[in-house]
Amino acid sequence: MQPIRRTPRGSTLLLTLAACATVSEPRSAAPAPMTMANAYPAPEDSGQRAPARYFLRRAWVQLTRDVARTRLPETVGLDLREMEQRPFAVAWLGHATTLVRAGTRWILLDPALFTYVGPVRGFGPKRLTPLPLLPEAFPRIDAVLISHDHFDHLDLASVRHLAAQPGGPPRFLVGRGLGQWFAENVGVEAEELDWWDRLPLGDIDLTFVPAQHSSGRTPWGKNETRWGGWVVGLGAQRFYFPGDTSYVAELFRDIRSRVGEIQLAALPIGAYTPREWMRFEHLDPEEAVLAHVDLGAVRSIGVHWATFQLGDEEPYQPALDLDRSVQAHAVQGFDVVPIGQVVDVPEPTPSAVDQRPSPPVATTNPEERHVPAGRRDAAN
């Protein structure tokens, strides 16, 4: 357990009531795009918004919690030299942020590298657990993969920091419609992909896959950009990162069918209460176990928990609930690991070697990847 200061009063409320905040990002002057939707059926009541009393209750729970006495996951220092020697390895850096070493490449997913996440700089949910590596000590990143534009997955300060790395910015790969935001706020081009698009990065192949979630950074920008997950492939080995998603069995089975065997998955297990609202957006630990089974994953690790307090559950509760669900379903290969621990992507099974994909080719037109949102067909 690590002593952490109590989150300043009002900082969480600013994020949970973000619609009332003054954001530090300009509103795009581009034509308004069409609204995007999930690819899989959702419950009839999934379009409802949480009432104001929910945000007030959540803010009260978080503001009155004694964080200094709260159980938190262990954080270990990340040894980049050790990780660099691994042929294909992953390190969870807290929340959804994940560093991947694949071959000779460094890939970073959903970077949130600083103290707060939220629409107002210096406010919002405060980091409970430290990064295992200071932002200034990161290796030169080859590609940054963004799952969707919610503040805890697309942090403006973090992507600006990465864009200014020595040697030039990494490639930023994002969902359809999000390139305009990067041009206006980060000053770099981002390559847009849609669901099932596949893109080469040297000998690595990257696939943008569906997720059952939503997008939007402002009250006027709901579901205008594509959300999804990523599969990072190296030969016959595959690492799956869903970003945020709710549970739809068909979604995970389709990923298994279309992409092939998943050797390692980083499945979100936190921010799942209260279920009457969170079930439309986030997996709970038991659903994460079901997703692990649906994917046929060789191994899964739990992420998206105990870093920023975004749900009503206690920070360590996801790990306890995951352990119970793993035992209840008699599942193997799914656990939690310390923040910063290097995890090897397991070797593929013989059947997975037979499923090895053809050499990656870009399945999106490079000329279309940087077209501003609103100038492309936003049909689903």
What are these regions (language model features)?
Residues 51, 121-173, 189, 259-266:
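Active-site metal-binding motif and surrounding structural segment of the metallo-beta-lactamase
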